């Protein structure tokens, strides 16, 4: 006697690859990887699903397997002999799934951030060249501070550009949620660079030259280059501000909220760094004017110290912002409330427990919840879809004939279908949550068996 066990692979979020992990008889788990080919999905774990099962020791009674492409996923039918059930677990899949995968790219709507970084990169290189030339001829301490500032800015923009590129890598086995947080890492490194190289070195340079005995030479040339740098940095700042506005519009935030709580740190980092650059140039100009008017050279290193403190404040702000993103920040309260309200109002949900969310990348979230399902509503929804009369007829016939074996078989089949119906309800909830908040890329819903001490949300 044979029984057919169906396994559904959810490939909705991975149109080219998928894997299944299922249990048969509650005692065995097996896992397979599928690649999408022209003629459907093909098992690539061990050439065929049959060889995968047979590779496990103590596995007996395998009759046949069949895997077909069913549009949104893969349907696999495994026929087994009831008398020789699967009794072992296939565990060697771990080595297979932890191999390094070929790096792919994913599309992220961050053109505004990329444009801001690229513009700032070239502008900082041009400004650095101008400032370095002026410092070489004038030996101004405040201009030296601006040279160091430009070096730090250029290096930091390069780090941000690398972070943008690396964050677009597609998810793989080692990082199933993707690499979107890479931009947080490199933004944090960039901020540390501003603090150490930009702020620290600039302040030290100013303190060391507080007792300079003579004003810096060639101040006129320095003033001209400061003006030119101001125009270049100002243009880059305008591009960064436009980038921040677009990012805020995409996330439905005000510009102020986006600067403090937005999910993409890149454009904010560019804007704050360019803003500090423009302010630093204004401070440098004021310092040179003060030296020229008073003849006192102390205003030159004082300007350097002020610029260094400005960079330090910018760096601390960026460090804190990226730190919160890296340690696992929840998604916005508005989106979270929207999801919880939807779940509480759904007919199959009795109670919610341990609901959590996390930002896994710019505009991308993960949501998790434990749900106490309303079993009666799950069954009613299932019977509405399949027809209750068919099941009632089978139960009546088994009861009329007094066939306990047939009754047990019907009850087993009915129980299996109810479990499948619960899975369908979970799939429906996950899909509707993602439609409600499109930024939620991953939804994990678990069935919860409540106890009197459980704190319901």
UniProtKB/Swiss-Prot annotation:
Gene Ontology cellular-component annotations: vacuolar membrane
GO BP term, example: zinc ion transport
Membrane topology of this protein: Multi-pass membrane protein
Chief location of this protein within or outside the cell: membrane
Vacuolar compartment spans: 137-141, 205-220, 289-297
The protein's role, per its UniProt record: Involved in sequestration of excess metal in the cytoplasm into vacuoles to maintain metal homeostasis.
Protein name in the entry: Metal tolerance protein C4
Organism: Arabidopsis thaliana (Mouse-ear cress)
């Amino acid at each position: 006697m044979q029984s057919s066990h169906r396994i559904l692979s959810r490939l909705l979020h991975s149109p080219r690859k998928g894997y299944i992990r299922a249990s048969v008889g509650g005692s065995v788990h097996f896992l397979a990887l599928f690649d999408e080919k022209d003629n459907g999905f093909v098992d690539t774990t061990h050439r065929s699903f049959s060889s995968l099962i047979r590779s496990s020791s103590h596995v007996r009674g395998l009759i046949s397997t069949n895997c077909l492409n069913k549009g949104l996923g893969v349907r696999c039918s495994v026929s087994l002999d009831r008398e020789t059930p699967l009794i072992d677990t296939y565990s060697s899949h771990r080595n297979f799934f932890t191999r390094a995968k070929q790096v792919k790219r994913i599309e992220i709507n961050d053109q505004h951030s990329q444009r801001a970084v690229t513009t700032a990169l070239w502008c900082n290189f041009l400004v650095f060249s101008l400032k370095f030339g002026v410092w070489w001829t004038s030996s101004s301490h405040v201009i030296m501070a601006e040279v160091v500032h430009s070096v730090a800015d250029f290096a930091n923009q390069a780090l941000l550009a690398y972070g943008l590129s690396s964050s677009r890598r597609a998810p793989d086995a080692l990082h199933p949620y993707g690499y979107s947080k890479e931009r947080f890492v490199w933004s944090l490194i960039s901020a540390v660079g501003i603090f150490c190289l930009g702020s620290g070195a600039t302040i030290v340079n100013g303190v060391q030259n507080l007792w300079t005995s003579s004003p810096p030479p060639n101040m006129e040339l320095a003033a001209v280059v400061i003006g030119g740098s101001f125009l270049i940095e100002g243009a880059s700042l305008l591009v960064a501000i436009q980038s921040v506005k677009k990012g805020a519009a995409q996330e439905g935030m005000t510009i102020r909220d986006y600067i403090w709580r937005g999910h993409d740190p890149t454009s904010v980092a560019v804007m704050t760094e360019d803003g500090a650059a423009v302010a630093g140039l204004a401070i440098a100009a004021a310092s040179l004017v003060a030296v020229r008017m008073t003849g006192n050279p102390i205003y030159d290193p004082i300007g350097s110290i002020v610029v260094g403190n400005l960079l330090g404040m910018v760096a601390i702000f960026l460090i804190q912002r990226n730190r919160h993103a890296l340690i696992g920040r929840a998604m916005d309260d508005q989106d979270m409330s929207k999801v919880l309200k939807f779940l509480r109002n759904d007919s199959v949900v009795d109670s919610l427990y341990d609901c959590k969310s996390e930002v896994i990348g710019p505009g991308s979230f993960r949501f998790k919840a434990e749900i106490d399902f309303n079993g009666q509503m799950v069954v009613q929804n299932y019977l509405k879809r399949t027809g209750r009369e068919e099941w009632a007829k089978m139960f009546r016939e088994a009861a009329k004939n007094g066939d306990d074996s047939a009754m047990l078989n019907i009850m087993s089949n009915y129980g299996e279908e109810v479990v499948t119906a619960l899975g369908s309800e979970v799939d429906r909830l996950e899909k509707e949550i993602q439609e409600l908040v499109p930024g939620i890329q991953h939804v994990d819903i678990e069935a919860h068996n409540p106890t009197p001490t459980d704190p319901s949300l």
